[in-house]
């Protein structure tokens, strides 16, 4: 038996079947670094239309987690896709470096500043710690295949950044949005500092729920305001009843608030105190009576809240009276409709108190302990004092009702401990003084939010948020570099110039310069009347002004930011702080689009935590499976909602990756010996099936690029998989194997096929590049005709051609053929299982079809057998179908499979009756004889 293997065009490539990504990727990264890939991209795109994705800085503390990996991969995919769309899209990664978490880590090592180390030494230790953390995180981000300005990132602790943060503070001052105030702020007693809105988490907390009597001081005057119902206005002490879940704030009570338009009822009740009269909102009366457990109650009279304004009530345990005041914040959602008001412990209380010039009492220290001059409760921690307050109320007959109550309560994001509202002298960016709130909302509406619900979410947050407290009482932070008058607290009249002088010092010496500056040196004679502010800036201000010191200031960023991309928690964090500072100083939003992704959860949808043991470390995934698997997983998810990850989910991504890799390998292996400069067949001269494949790639590229532009990576990966697995793997590539392997090596039939494969791999490698970056570059290196060294420096492939819809062999034609082929495959598989045939090349298929379908399939003529991968395929009228023909799911199509009576060709394995008709090649069919010794077969259709 002769060996015809040498006459076949067998696939050949050095591109391995197995990715071995964990071993191969680090070597590729080293090569990219050595060859300055990122800077080559920048050079290639210089002068192109800019697209700026501004990086929200991760915090420089700890190893990166899977959420960090998702965020950085998404950004990298988008930047690379924009680069392929021929934008100049630099990526400057950043880090957030100041603040409490780093202070706490350094405190563990060296103690608090001022004890074992000076404040200056402590700041340097913090800087050193952040530097080390950044280096670790940077290595992990680079390992993910993220390209960027890694040798020159932005860091909020860089001297230039610190200086520009101070300059932007000066711009806020100049725009008139900065205020100093004694206001209630979220305060963490563990941090000993105010917290920003973004640093507050809400968790369930069990608190005392109490209703408390405030006795009326002048009952005669009070009852005159009520319209009687029936005879008289009853008997017994009169009390206004308030409801609260923060008994510890009662020492600071300075009023009871009523709603001016609400009706209040004077109610006769019998209690443990005997006959008494209580005042509650009429709308809440039934609920209150039920809660209090009183019997024999009836309404004596009613009055509007506005009629009771300025009436005095007795504080429940201190020897002074407080007024009844009016406030629009009072509701009938719960409670009694009479609101305990402590201006030092609540924003609404503070605001309404200011209208009545109430004292802003603040009897609580920074550590959460009542001050020494606080009657009854001095020295007690507020949360421990709750029960003591309840006891005192009960002893004095002021307690109406008391139960335990579970409710959502603000907690410190770092310590996970309950917060208090505490009035302290702080610096604020005013939301309303100069119209910042309204201007910010206007800019929100000009921005594109993806998903769309982000717009209403951040709008409601901005609409309802308090003034932004930007001051902190910390050591490691950018200073609020202001001089204020000792007595009045007013800013120095030369503040603009002073801020610039400080910024210049900080630019060369870092933030320590502020604490080292002698006021005399800068202020001269004014040093006696003006003092330095020693507070530091909220770290959300640091990162929130990165639009100023990164996007506006850096030479390698050519324009304002097009896109911010972070987790959905950043609506109340970085998106908001960036918006407010940009609108305050520049009058517009810092971004054109804002895209958010969800949080990672485990395979069962549960939140990830170390305690549950369900975390997935990106480092372990890259070390085991490779970064491309992680990148493909990220792109394959609907990342705008929760993102599930588990070993099983990653395994599915690895399986999908193998299908893409195998398709790529087939393309490369069958381009051996092909030179596009000499062998490329023009589109119009190609075999019809090859035209279709190129045209499908053209359509697919249009859809994929559109999906990239919409940041819809799930659609990109779905299209990739559809193209590789179905349209190529199960159809086109399956069909062309015979022609590719058996046709004469330089024949038109084979060169047409190779030309299609060439166009397809040129397009496919670029579609893949933003997502499976390492594999795309690996493929690129196996394409010897490429002039560019890297796939990332070019653009989408422009050599694809679309087949016109009005042509005979258009996409609709081939889609119909594909549907018939699926039915043929299914029917052959049934025949194989029944033992009628072995493989498909042993089969003869007779296709019985209705007139229209039969006419369509007949266009393939004798080449239909190559499409169906059978030794024979004939098309006949449906009327002639035999009784044992198989009906299919394609309307009007029946199939009949039988074993071929022809002999098996030793070269192409088709069973043909003409095998052995050539004496020189008795084991070959006539087609193979032509391909071996003759001019080679011709193909027109497949």
From Swiss-Prot:
SUPFAM superfamilies with a match to the protein in the record: Anticodon-binding domain of a subclass of class I aminoacyl-tRNA synthetases (SSF47323), Nucleotidylyl transferase (SSF52374), ValRS/IleRS/LeuRS editing domain (SSF50677)
**Obligatory cofactor(s):** Zn(2+)
The UniProt entry's coiled-coil ranges are none
Location comes to:
Cytoplasm
Matches recorded under HAMAP family: Ile_tRNA_synth_type1
The entry describes its oligomerization and partners as: Monomer.
Entry text on domains: IleRS has two distinct active sites: one for aminoacylation and one for editing. The misactivated valine is translocated from the active site to the editing site, which sterically excludes the correctly activated isoleucine. The single editing site contains two valyl binding pockets, one specific for each substrate (Val-AMP or Val-tRNA(Ile)).
UniProt-annotated binding residues for Zn(2+): 905, 908, 925, 928
Motif 'HIGH' region, residue numbers: 58-68
Where do the annotations place L-isoleucyl-5'-AMP binding?
566
What protein name is recorded for this chain?
A: Isoleucine--tRNA ligase
**Native organism:** Pseudoalteromonas atlantica (strain T6c / ATCC BAA-1087)
One function term, GO molecular function aspect: ATP binding
Looking at the Swiss-Prot or TrEMBL record, what is one Pfam family this protein matches? Anticodon_1
UniProt binding sites for ATP: 610
Q: Which UniProt keywords apply?
A: Aminoacyl-tRNA synthetase, ATP-binding, Cytoplasm, Ligase, Metal-binding, Nucleotide-binding, Protein biosynthesis, Zinc
Q: Which gene encodes it?
A: ileS
Role summary: Catalyzes the attachment of isoleucine to tRNA(Ile). As IleRS can inadvertently accommodate and process structurally similar amino acids such as valine, to avoid such errors it has two additional distinct tRNA(Ile)-dependent editing activities. One activity is designated as 'pretransfer' editing and involves the hydrolysis of activated Val-AMP. The other activity is designated 'posttransfer' editing and involves deacylation of mischarged Val-tRNA(Ile).
- As recorded in UniProt, its EC number(s) are 6.1.1.5
């Amino acid at each position: 038996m002769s060996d015809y293997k040498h006459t076949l065009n067998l696939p050949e490539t050095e591109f391995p079947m197995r990715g071995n990504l964990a071993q191969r990727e680090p070597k590729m990264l080293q090569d990219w670094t050595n060859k300055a890939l990122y800077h080559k991209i920048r050079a290639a795109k210089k002068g192109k239309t800019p697209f700026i994705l501004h990086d929200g800085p991760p915090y420089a503390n700890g190893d990166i987690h899977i959420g960090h990996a998702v965020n950085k991969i998404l950004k990298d995919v988008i930047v690379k896709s924009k680069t392929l769309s021929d934008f100049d899209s630099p990526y400057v990664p950043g880090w957030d470096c100041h603040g409490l978490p780093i202070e706490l880590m350094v405190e563990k090592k060296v103690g608090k500043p001022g004890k074992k180390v000076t404040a200056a030494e402590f700041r340097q230790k913090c800087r050193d710690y952040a530097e080390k953390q950044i280096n670790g995180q940077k290595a992990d981000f680079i390992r993910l295949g993220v390209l960027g300005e890694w040798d020159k990132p932005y860091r909020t602790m860089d001297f230039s950044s610190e200086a520009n943060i101070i300059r932007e503070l000066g711009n806020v001052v100049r725009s008139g949005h900065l205020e100093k105030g004694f206001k209630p702020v979220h305060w963490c007693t563990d941090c000993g500092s105010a917290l920003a809105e973004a640093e507050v988490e809400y968790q369930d907390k069990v608190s005392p729920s109490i209703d408390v009597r405030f006795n009326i001081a002048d009952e005669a005057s009070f009852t005159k305001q009520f319209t009687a119902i029936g005879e008289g206005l009853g008997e017994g002490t009169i009390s206004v009843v308030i409801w609260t879940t923060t008994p510890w704030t009662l020492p600071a009570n300075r009023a009871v608030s009523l709603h001016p338009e609400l009706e209040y009822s004077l109610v006769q009740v019998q209690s443990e105190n005997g006959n008494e009269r209580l005042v509650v909102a009429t709308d809440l009366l039934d609920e209150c009576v039920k809660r209090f457990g009183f019997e024999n109650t009836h309404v004596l009279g009613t009055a509007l809240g506005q009629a009771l304004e300025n009436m005095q009530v007795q504080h429940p345990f201190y020897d002074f009276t407080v007024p009844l005041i009016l406030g629009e914040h009072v509701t009938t959602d719960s409670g009694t409709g009479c609101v305990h008001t402590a201006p030092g412990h609540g924003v609404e209380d503070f605001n309404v108190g200011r209208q009545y010039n109430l004292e802003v009492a603040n009897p609580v220290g920074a550590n959460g302990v009542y001050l020494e001059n606080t009657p009854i409760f001095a020295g007690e921690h507020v949360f421990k004092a709750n029960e003591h307050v309840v006891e005192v109320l009960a002893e004095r007959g002021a307690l109406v009702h008391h139960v335990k109550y579970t409710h959502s309560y603000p907690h410190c994001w770092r310590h996970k401990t309950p917060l208090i509202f505490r009035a302290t002298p702080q610096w604020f960016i005013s939301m309303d003084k100069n119209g910042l709130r309204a201007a910010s909302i206007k800019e929100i509406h000009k921005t594109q939010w993806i998903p769309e619900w982000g717009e209403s979410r951040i709008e409601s947050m901005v609409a309802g948020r308090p003034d932004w407290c930007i001051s902190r009482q910390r050591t490691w932070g950018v200073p609020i570099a202001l001089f204020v008058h000792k007595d009045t607290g007013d800013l120095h009249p030369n503040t603009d110039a002073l801020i610039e002088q400080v910024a210049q010092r900080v630019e060369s010496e870092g933030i320590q310069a502020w604490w080292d500056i002698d006021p005399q040196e800068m202020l001269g004679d004014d040093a006696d009347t003006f003092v330095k502010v020693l507070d530091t800036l909220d770290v959300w201000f640091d990162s929130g002004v990165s639009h100023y010191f990164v996007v506006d200031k850096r030479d390698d960023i050519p324009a304002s930011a097009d896109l911010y991309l972070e987790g959905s928690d950043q609506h109340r964090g970085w998106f908001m702080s960036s918006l407010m500072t940009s609108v305050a100083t520049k009058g517009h939003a810092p971004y054109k689009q804002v895209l958010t992704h969800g949080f990672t959860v485990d395979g069962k949808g549960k939140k990830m935590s170390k305690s549950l043991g369900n975390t997935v470390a990106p480092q372990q995934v890259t070390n085991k499976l490779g970064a491309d698997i992680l990148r493909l997983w990220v792109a394959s998810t609907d990342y705008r909602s929760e993102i599930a990850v588990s070993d099983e989910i990653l395994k599915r991504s690895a399986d999908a990756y193998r299908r893409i890799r195998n398709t790529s390998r087939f393309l490369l292996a069958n381009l051996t010996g092909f030179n596009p400069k000499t062998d490329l067949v023009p589109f119009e001269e190609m075999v019809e099936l090859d035209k279709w494949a190129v045209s499908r790639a053209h359509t697919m590229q249009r859809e994929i690029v559109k999906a990239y532009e919409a940041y819809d990576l799930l659609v990109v990966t779905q299209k990739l998989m559809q193209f590789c697995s179905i349209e190529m793997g199960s159809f086109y590539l399956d069909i062309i194997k015979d022609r590719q392997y058996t046709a004469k090596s330089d024949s038109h039939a084979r060169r047409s096929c190779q030309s299609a494969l060439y166009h397809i791999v040129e397009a496919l490698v670029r579609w893949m590049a933003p997502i499976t970056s390492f594999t795309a570059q690996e493929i690129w290196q196996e394409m010897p005709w490429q002039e560019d060294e890297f796939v990332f420096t070019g653009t989408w492939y422009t050599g694809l051609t679309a087949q016109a819809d009005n042509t005979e062999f258009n996409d609709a034609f081939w889609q119909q053929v594909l549907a018939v082929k699926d039915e043929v495959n299914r029917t052959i598989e049934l025949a194989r299982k029944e033992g009628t045939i072995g493989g498909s090349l042993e089969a003869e298929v007779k296709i019985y079809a209705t007139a229209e379908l039969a006419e369509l399939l007949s266009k393939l003529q004798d080449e239909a057998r190559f499409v169906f991968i059978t030794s024979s395929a004939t098309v006949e009228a449906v009327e002639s179908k035999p009784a044992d023909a198989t009906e299919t799911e394609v309307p009007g199509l029946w199939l009949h499979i039988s074993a071929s009576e022809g002999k098996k060709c030793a070269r192409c394995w088709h069973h043909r009756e003409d095998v052995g008709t050539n004496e020189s090649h008795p084991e070959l069919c006539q087609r193979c004889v032509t391909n071996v010794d003759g001019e080679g077969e011709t193909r027109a259709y497949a």
